[in-house]
């Protein structure tokens, strides 16, 4: 497993060792890092970033002790859920302890001293291409947009290789960390573009009186009305169903895992709802009980 540990601090080694190591998917300056720093700064904690190439190494890093926690994207308001990540949550023992929402602002950046007219090629991730296509078509059609594996890595390469005439579309954090100049901020087509990130950190304890959200995974008997019964119970106990995702159970035709997010006003009422619904469920797995992000 390849991981990279980053820190912006110039602390002594023992101070660095005391900083919480947070695993993320992506490269220095990516939106995962932005989400991680936003969440932990509110907690008053300094962190070191453990960068992983894909999502499963986040969990491996926590298992191996290379990371103390992980921050993982789970859904986006435009592209929907990251389906493989639901399976990772079910497959590993780490519980959700919080969440954070980040508005995805895409910025066109390049080495300082250039104008948009000087840029001939832009590198970025395919999702960022889809989110910014209209800007390039309407404002700078001479630029060739090239798909890259990661938004932040594109910015890193431009800075490290001194590439003139080449731009990247990435976060403002990527521009700041790599000394790039933002030529055009906020070039995404849809401004209401948010990604939800989950906090997986066993060191965090959330008081019960502050818990107002839970993520569950369960299966149901393969018979008519089984899901409707669960939804009726949740409604009776005033549970707000904010997300439901079904995924096939391998080896079981037309049977599914159900992943559910529910919000509630009191923890006791939530536990009552869970107690009432549990006899109708199979293989209930509480993936996390936490304070929702406002």
Model feature map: region roles:
Residues 2-294:
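Domain-level signature for soluble enzymes in the chorismate/prephenate branch of the shikimate pathway
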């Amino acid at each position: 497993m390849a991981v990279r540990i980053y820190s912006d601090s110039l602390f002594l080694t023992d101070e660095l060792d005391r900083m919480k190591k947070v695993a993320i998917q992506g490269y220095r300056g990516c939106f995962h890092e932005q989400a991680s720093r936003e969440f932990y700064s509110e907690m008053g904690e300094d962190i070191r970033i453990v960068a992983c190439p894909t999502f499963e190494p986040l969990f491996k890093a926590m298992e191996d002790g290379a990371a103390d926690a992980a921050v993982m994207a789970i859904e986006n308001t435009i592209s929907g859920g990251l389906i493989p990540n639901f399976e990772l949550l079910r497959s590993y023992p780490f519980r959700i302890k919080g969440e954070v929402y980040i508005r995805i602002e895409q910025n066109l950046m390049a080495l300082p001293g250039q104008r948009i007219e000087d840029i001939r090629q832009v590198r970025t991730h395919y999702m960022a291409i889809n989110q910014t296509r209209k800007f390039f078509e309407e404002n700078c059609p001479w630029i060739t947009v090239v798909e890259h594996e990661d938004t932040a890595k594109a910015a890193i390469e431009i800075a490290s290789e001194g590439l003139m005439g080449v731009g990247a579309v990435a976060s403002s954090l990527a521009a700041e960390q790599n000394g790039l100049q933002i030529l055009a901020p906020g070039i995404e087509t849809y401004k209401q573009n948010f990604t939800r990130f989950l906090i997986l950190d066993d060191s965090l304890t959330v008081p019960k009186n502050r818990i107002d959200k839970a993520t569950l995974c369960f299966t149901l008997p393969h018979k008519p009305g089984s899901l409707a019964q669960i939804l009726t119970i949740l409604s009776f106990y005033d549970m707000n169903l904010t997300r439901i995702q079904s995924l096939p159970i391998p080896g079981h035709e037309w049977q599914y895992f159900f992943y559910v997010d529910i919000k509630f006003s009191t923890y006791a009422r939530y536990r009552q709802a869970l107690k009432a619904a549990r006899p109708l469920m199979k293989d209930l797995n509480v993936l996390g009980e936490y304070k929702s992000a406002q």
